[in-house]
Regions:
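Short, structured beta-strand/loop micro-motifs enriched in basic residues and often containing a Trp
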Residues: 25-57, 199-210
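Short, surface-exposed secondary-structure edge patches
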Residues: 55-65, 211-216
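Sec/Tat signal peptide C-region and signal peptidase I cleavage site
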Residues: 16-20
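Low-complexity, Gly/Ser/Thr/Pro-rich intrinsically disordered linker/tail segments
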Residues: 239, 250-284
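Sec-dependent N-terminal signal peptides
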Residues: 4-14
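N-terminal capping segments
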Residues: 21-22, 30-38, 99, 104-195, ...
Length: 284
């Protein structure tokens, strides 16, 4: 009896240590990260033909799309019909205001944490070219893969043929404002504007006119506030992604004038409050 008890305790201890091991997931392809574990309610719904949108036509359940080879720490596993949903954390998205979820079919599992994806910042000229190539793409809340994810049509197969626009939404085609620069830099910039307002170094603009600000700007400077970012392309042009127009170029001075109507130019985001914006220079 004593030997049996000892054997039981050894087996129990071994099993407990096995179950307590951290598990990790590695994105094998572009991996959508949502703030809900009910992916099927977003892509398909009861009819199997609709994408869940809010009153502004946005998929608010979307957080971002993880690059291939992104490493996730699995916090919890939620079984579904033929696949799992994982509650996760990742260094690529350090925002804690909501839980994050991924679909098991987009990732591979490991019990050992491996090195995260390699982050190589493209040359400045390549980043600028990447931005220009995305002109004309639609706005996608939480999107940072302009061409979308074709596997969404396989893993969440629609019940019938979709309209072109619904298929774009289903595939998560397009980028949001910070997703535009995130994709152009291969995921080397912070994903959200709440971080971009302090990213890089400040450009002093307090009290300046739109023309005076424009004269100080360099390509890839960020005109940013918590909620939106506009990216400088050259001395005359900016680019941004908006719900109304998607990815579009604008006249730099004219865009600054429109911003100054509603917001105050400040040097340091954290030094004041209210409607304001800053310029951040993160690459020379």
């Amino acid at each position: 009896m004593k030997k049996f008890l000892i054997l039981f305790l050894i087996i129990f201890a071994f099993a407990g240590s096995s179950f307590s091991q951290d598990k990790f997931a590695i994105a094998r392809i572009w991996t959508p990260v949502l703030n809900t574990d009910d992916f099927e309610s977003v892509f398909g719904g009861k009819s199997g033909t609709k994408v869940k949108l809010d009153g502004k036509g946005l998929i608010r359940e979307m957080e971002f799309i993880a690059f291939p080879n992104t490493v996730f720490n699995i916090v919890n596993t939620i079984p579904k019909n033929g696949y799992d949903i994982y509650e996760v954390t990742t260094e690529d998205y350090p925002y804690t205001s909501t839980k994050l979820y991924i679909d098991s079919r987009f990732v591979n599992l490991t019990d050992t944490k491996i090195q995260d994806r390699e982050r190589l910042l493209p040359q400045k000229e390549i980043i600028l070219e990447n931005l220009k190539l995305m002109e004309g793409y639609p706005y996608m809340w939480g999107g940072n893969v302009a061409d979308g994810i074709s596997e969404m049509m396989e893993y969440y197969k629609p019940a019938k043929e979709l309209t072109n626009r619904t298929e774009e939404l289903w595939k998560l085609k397009g980028v949001d404002c910070s997703g535009l620069i995130y994709q152009a830099t291969n995921g080397n910039t912070p994903r959200n504007t709440s971080s971009l307002v302090n990213y890089g170094n400040p450009v002093e603009i307090n009290g300046l006119s739109a023309k005076e600000i424009a004269e100080k700007l360099q390509p890839l400077d960020l005109i940013v506030w918590s909620g939106h970012v506009v990216i400088v392309l050259d001395e005359n042009t900016a680019i941004e992604s908006t719900p109304a127009e998607g990815v579009n170029k604008t006249d730099l001075v004219a865009r600054l004038k429109s911003i100054l109507i509603e917001r105050k130019a400040v040097d340091d985001w954290n030094s004041t409050s209210g409607k304001r914006f800053v310029i951040r220079r993160w690459v020379e």
